[in-house]
Amino acid sequence: MDDKRFWDRYSKNYSALMRRSERMYLQIHKAIRPFLKRDMDVLELACGTGQLSVPLSPYVRTWEATDFSPEMVTQAKKQLHTSRLHFSVQDATKLPYGPESFDAVVISNALHIMPQPEKALSEAWRVLKPGGFLFAPTFVWGNGRWAGFRLWVMGLSGFHVYHRWTAGKLMAYLSERKYAILHHQLLGSKYAPL
């Protein structure tokens, strides 16, 4: 099964599954919120069903939430949202937006499951205004004895993890792609450290 079919298949249950990590998402909201300003235009890549888009979009001028799964976007559009929020199906590695279009790019819980995250990061860099922010909460490889087993079980359903970064290796990976790390924080979740 390819990745898009996997996410389309799980889109109806994704929000319920992510509720198990509600505390983690609240921590992500709390970390991102102070950087958001009313005059900002934000692009979100891999928005899923709107776990970040819906609660954070009221704090900015516009929030363009995208995902490559049409079914995820369909589910996201069912969420309560504001006129500032727009959902669309987009490929994070081939964005239709012009250079320097956004004040911030959010790519949450997705870099590790992208076959070529460097392409998405390059596109994010291209569409970011000078001095813009990238918010990239990402599951990292932990030391827990159950981490490998969980991934194996998830893999049986078609879920692919292409990159198993530690927190340090993820920061190095981002730095190698021009991003300056202003803040990092390790959060816990039901699945893996973030």
Where are these regions (language model features)?
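A short glycine-rich, Lys/Arg-flanked "PGG" loop and its adjoining helix->strand segment in the class I
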Residues: 118-130
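Short alpha-helix
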Residues: 162-177
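A short acidic, Gly/Pro-enriched loop at the edge of an enzyme's catalytic core
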Residues: 93-104
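Conserved Class I S-adenosyl-L-methionine
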Residues: 147-166
